[in-house]
Amino acid sequence: MDTIKSFKGYGKVNELEQQAYEKKTRKRLIIIAVSSIVLIAVIIAAVAGVVIHNRNSESSPSSDSVPQTELSPAASLKAVCDTTRYPSSCFSSISSLPESNTTDPELLFKLSLRVAIDELSSFPSKLRANAEQDARLQKAIDVCSSVFGDALDRLNDSISALGTVAGRIASSASVSNVETWLSAALTDQDTCLDAVGELNSTAARGALQEIETAMRNSTEFASNSLAIVTKILGLLSRFETPIHHRRLLGFPEWLGAAERRLLEEKNNDSTPDAVVAKDGSGQFKTIGEALKLVKKKSEERFSVYVKEGRYVENIDLDKNTWNVMIYGDGKDKTFVVGSRNFMDGTPTFETATFAVKGKGFIAKDIGFVNNAGASKHQAVALRSGSDRSVFFRCSFDGFQDTLYAHSNRQFYRDCDITGTIDFIFGNAAVVFQSCKIMPRQPLPNQFNTITAQGKKDPNQNTGIIIQKSTITPFGNNLTAPTYLGRPWKDFSTTVIMQSDIGALLNPVGWMSWVPNVEPPTTIFYAEYQNSGPGADVSQRVKWAGYKPTITDRNAEEFTVQSFIQGPEWLPNAAVQFDSTL
């Protein structure tokens, strides 16, 4: 996330393109306003149809006397598509399918996913064939190939999550899952652009333009699917016609019986499946060796105990490595240490000392370190794209880009995080609770920005939330200007609440991605009930998208319960958490 070379900033927007976009946006707002009545009618009719169907099924085989709701498939599709950012591509891509002659909103959503999957599946063949002429560009293209595969998995998972029961609407839990996975799929595609865009070569600039053009359809189609699930299925799920009945007590519905028993047994870290020790007193001397035992796509928890020591190795748990728990003897005793960095030729995405994609990852009492140093610029200690991942009593030590909360739902509790520029960044739905966040002295003439949030689509359910934490200097030599963060993308979302902010903070609080360029009005940056000498908001930035205070009701939207659905899965990770304010 280099200040100058990064492609990611909103400041890179062409002025003419921005004017055209604003004109298009105004036109779309008018269209949406007009079509809202139609859309509401479609939704009411869809729910009415479901209710009629259910009542009819429960009464008698004959339904001749029950009035049926008649809808125009074309009108339904148009109303649905008018809620998306790209209504034209939504309508044209779905209406071309034979199955589109329907008014079922869930089927229309699945068709939108189908066109997104078809488009993304063909994308790898469109990647630049001569990338091998530039070694760094080839590494960036490799990142693209990896994240496209992840995005496809998210799209397929979204189809599976809604089930196959006809005439019923998805449950709110299913909708939340799908919103998360589609948000991640969009983030994956954006990560490709980031990897190529951070390079500063002629070949990279040409490749970036080529890839952006080739990705336009896949990005729009995925965005359309996300808008439909957020604005249509999300509303329908509030009616009492769920496709899967949600459990209100006990373990969350996504856990199987075997997984529940294992979690009950292993919550106390008493029965590890593997023990790692540098001195040879365990089964393995390296973490990597122990992780080779993990079965792919296993619903069973696999736990690894890592004894005190510094383990110099890079770990990458792929998307098919599920439900791994790794724990040590303490965040200041057991460390995983690496030194990969951007300056030596590694894409930021691949610099992580420890990277995890597979769902259900848990880390406890362990530290993650990237010791490349400030002069090496981007150097990630930990990157997580693991859905429902938990980090409890962990430490993350680095300089620029220390902690990459890339995508999906994540929770950090009682953790220590040090760094300089953008040292908590990414586009996950992530909550940091009761953590110690410690900016450190950067290179001369540099500044510190704690966060850089990467939300690029308004319907993504993502953001960085820091709650009940402390923000204090690391060491006693911090003199560099220090800020709570800077907006990385057009819809960046960051909330600092109920935290203690030290005197280290510059009174303006936040800074723009591009100096002297105000962020888009579409960002959401807010503070709520903070304390300490740095919590005074009287001199804060005056951006349209910044809120120096928000209501209790607004703040509730960013709690563990509302933002990451924590009560459904955190109790089984044996981690403390506050679900509300």
Swiss-Prot record:
Where in the chain are disulfide-linked cysteines found? C415-C435
The record lists glycosylation at: N101, N156, N200, N217, N268, N477
Q: Which residues form the active site?
A: D401, D422
Specify the domain of life of the species encoding this protein: Eukaryota
Its main localization is secreted
Q: What is this protein called?
A: Pectinesterase 3
Q: In which pathway does it act?
A: Glycan metabolism; pectin degradation; 2-dehydro-3-deoxy-D-gluconate from pectin: step 1/5
- What is the protein's species of origin? Phaseolus vulgaris
Q: Which InterPro entries match?
A: Invertase/methylesterase_inhib, Pectin_lyas_fold, Pectin_lyase_fold/virulence, Pectinesterase_Asp_AS, Pectinesterase_cat, Pectinesterase_inhib_dom, Pectinesterase_Tyr_AS
Listed PROSITE patterns: PECTINESTERASE_1, PECTINESTERASE_2
Query: Is Ribosomal protein given among the entry's keywords?
Result: no
What is one Gene Ontology biological process annotated in the Swiss-Prot or TrEMBL record? cell wall modification
What's in the keyword line of the UniProt record?
Answer: Aspartyl esterase, Cell wall, Cell wall biogenesis/degradation, Disulfide bond, Glycoprotein, Hydrolase, Secreted, Signal
Q: Which family does it belong to?
A: In the N-terminal section; belongs to the PMEI family. In the C-terminal section; belongs to the pectinesterase family.
**Catalyzes what?**
[(1->4)-alpha-D-galacturonosyl methyl ester](n) + n H2O = [(1->4)-alpha-D-galacturonosyl](n) + n methanol + n H(+)
